[in-house]
């Protein structure tokens, strides 16, 4: 049930499959949830600005049922994105959403 959605104005990069897998493994590790439940989304070339500039930037959404640790996860995912895409950490926003189990559907039902 953990989900990470990364949107960036950076053009499609070589190694996007590797980045998806890195994000998936990092999210599973950060939440303690099985990677078999993790979903990753990666959207390149999104028209976006940060601080009035269209220099490389990113917006990340992380959603899960409980077990979010925003301070640690913010550092971890900013470092991963900086290393993979070269986006400075001060040009990345991350939104965290602790979703109620009754509001997360999968396999024709909800988790709660």
Where are these regions (language model features)?
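Interaction-mediating elements
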Residues: 1-112
